[in-house]
Swiss-Prot record:
GO cellular component: cytoplasm
Keyword Transferase: yes
Name of this protein: Isocitrate dehydrogenase kinase/phosphatase
Catalytic activity of the protein: L-seryl-[isocitrate dehydrogenase] + ATP = O-phospho-L-seryl-[isocitrate dehydrogenase] + ADP + H(+)
Any GO MF annotation of the entry: ATP binding
Length: 577
């Protein structure tokens, strides 16, 4: 290769990233217009297209580089010089951290995810931790109650860029003050002030005002979800002011926010104070930088692995028929490998399973489906793998494993947040906790269905419980769109003997689902059956599911709330006359 080509290649990669992030910001900047026009289908399409931008631009850069090098192979020394030049371009670059991830992605695409070493890639960042360039304008604005909180909140709302009419601005301000007074007391509220992000956070059918409530006791989140009435008027649905509530809003089972962030590192740093339980990876994920979140997630894994003496073990729970799942006992994530052969009742291919996981990545997860990061050629030290797990890996996924002596390489796997399997949770709880879990499970099914997702396999073992007690679906191999399912009533039996026969007395076609059968799987436990019948009996009726299908086919997009119904102002406070 001619000398000097290394710098050209480095510049080409960085320019490619510039183009990608420019398009990312362009799609994001349309969120306000989509919200104001109540174009919810465009919201869903924009979410999908923004996810695809990254891989598309990586592909464009790879093609450029193949043209520049005339398709010639490059030696290790050449690649190291390219990385050196690229590193020198980053100190004054405003999005250095994601630019490093983009470099990694281009390298992996060129070299088929092989030879992934710290010398060749930005396994860890080349820049000082949490460094970002001086911010050209503040991320947030401070508001003080010099003339009381009513005046403060009126200024906050008046500063919003939204151009729609408000249904009742005074009512909403009254509700917010009432909530804050109940939480802090009048005297403490008078000594508090707000810092509000300049950009709104858009997701689904809501625009979120995100701020910090600075009180005498410390800083709290201040989140206001802004919705529209059927007449296109704005209203504030609730006010959330605890870290637990904020954590759920920014949770790993939700779609990414659309928030205009030309300096993502600065925004992540600003959010960190009100989301102390979130890792760097989770914060980048929440604002839509999912590929860099994958980089940060891998770094968090490496740091944990370096500081522990644990070995990988099979994850607790009922062993899956499609996936082999393992974890580190103290780590908050699980690793999922598609098995070489599935159980006989699972008539599907590995390609189908991967397509299902991609569907979840692109779809509105409504807080009920765990996000995943996909890895290829994932290297594990054998000393970190328990003998029992190693035996299981070789038994169930040998075709995906390459033995390198002291290491193995797993050709393909997913990393996902670790949860307590719902079936295990239900065995361990009773009373109100049991009731809450069954209520959450039914709500998860309803919300998935309203978002045009049918889980397929609805057994408790395919759901997990988060640290906030939310029930989340995580087994995607039988997932499909609601509109693809034929929900049927079981026909009346012809003779009494039909009910005792081993085979059904009626025909069953692919895609047929009989909701009445759910009762046999979900209500067998005498502790659970009565609760299910009380709260979710309609899930056993085919007409319930068909009615949902009709709403979806008519183009209706359901509201999705990242908080309990009882927290909504319309439920919590009686509307003013």
């Amino acid at each position: 290769m001619p000398r000097g080509l290394e710098l050209l290649i480095a510049q080409t990669i960085l320019q490619g990233f510039d183009a990608q992030y420019g398009r990312f910001l362009e799609v994001t900047s349309g969120a306000q217009q989509r919200f104001e026009q109540a174009d919810w289908h465009a919201v869903q399409q924009a979410m999908k297209s923004r996810i695809h931008l990254y891989d598309h631009h990586v592909g464009l850069v790879v093609e450029q580089l193949r043209c520049i090098t005339n398709g010639q192979s490059t030696d290790a020394a050449f690649l190291l010089r390219v990385k050196e030049h690229y590193t020198r371009l980053l100190p004054d670059y405003p999005r250095f951290e994601i630019a490093e991830s983009f470099f990694n992605s281009v390298y992996c695409r060129l070299f088929d995810h092989r030879s992934l070493t710290p010398e060749r890639l930005f396994i860890f960042s080349s820049q000082p931790e949490r460094r970002f360039r001086t911010i050209p304008r503040p991320l947030a604005k401070d508001f003080y109650p010099d003339h009381g909180w009513e005046s403060l909140l009126m200024r906050v709302i008046s500063d919003l860029p939204l151009r729609l009419r408000w249904q009742n601005k005074s009512r909403d301000i009254h509700y917010i003050i009432r909530h804050l007074t109940e939480m802090l007391g009048t005297d403490n509220l008078a000594e508090s002030h707000l810092q509000v992000a300049n950009e709104l956070f858009y997701r689904n059918k809501a625009a979120w005002l995100v701020g910090k409530l600075n009180t005498p006791f410390g800083t709290l989140p201040f989140l206001l979800p802004i919705h529209q009435t059927d007449d296109g008027e704005l209203f504030i649905d609730t006010c959330l002011t605890t870290t637990a509530e904020a954590s759920i809003v920014f949770g790993f089972a939700r779609s990414y926010f659309m928030v205009y962030a030309p300096l993502p590192a600065a925004l992540v740093e600003w959010l960190r104070e009100i989301l102390p339980g979130k890792t760097t990876a989770e914060l980048y994920m929440a604002i839509g930088c999912q590929k860099h979140a994958k980089t940060e997630s891998y770094r968090e894994y490496l740091v944990y692995l370096q500081g522990c003496n644990e070995q990988f073990i099979e994850a607790p729970g009922i062993r899956g028929m499609v996936m082999l799942v393992f974890t580190l006992p103290g780590f908050d994530r699980v690793f999922k490998v598609i098995k070489d052969k599935f159980a006989p009742q699972k008539e599907m291919s590995a390609a189908h399973v991967r397509a299902c996981y991609q569907l979840v990545k692109e779809h509105d997860r409504v807080g009920r489906m765990a996000d995943t990061q996909e890895f290829e050629n994932f290297v594990l030290e054998k000393r970190h793998i328990s003998p029992t797990l190693m035996e299981l890996l070789l038994q169930e996924a040998a075709e995906k494993i390459t033995d390198l002596g002291e290491q193995i390489v797993i050709r393909h796997l997913y990393i996902e947040r670790r949860m307590v399997p719902l079936n295990i949770w239900l065995e361990q709880v009773e009373g109100q906790q049991l009731r809450d879990a069954i209520e959450e499970y039914g709500n998860a099914i309803r919300q998935l269905a309203a978002a045009n997702i049918f889980p397929g396999d609805m057994l408790f073992k395919n759901f997990g419980v988060t640290r906030h007690g939310r029930v989340v679906f995580y087994d995607y191999d039988e997932i499909c769109y609601m509109t693809e399912v034929n929900f049927r009533d079981i026909p009346p039996s012809r003779y009494p003997e039909d009910e005792l026969a081993s085979e059904p007395w009626y025909s069953v076609s692919p895609g047929d689902v009989f909701p009445e059968e759910f009762r046999h799987w979900l209500c067998a436990d005498p502790r659970i059956g009565p609760l299910f019948e009380e709260m979710h009996a309609d899930l056993f009726r085919a007409d319930y599911w068909r009615a949902l299908q009709n709403r979806i086919r008519e183009g209706h997009v359901e509201d999705v709330y990242a908080y309990r119904r009882r927290q909504r102002f319309s439920v919590r406070y009686r509307p003013q006359v």
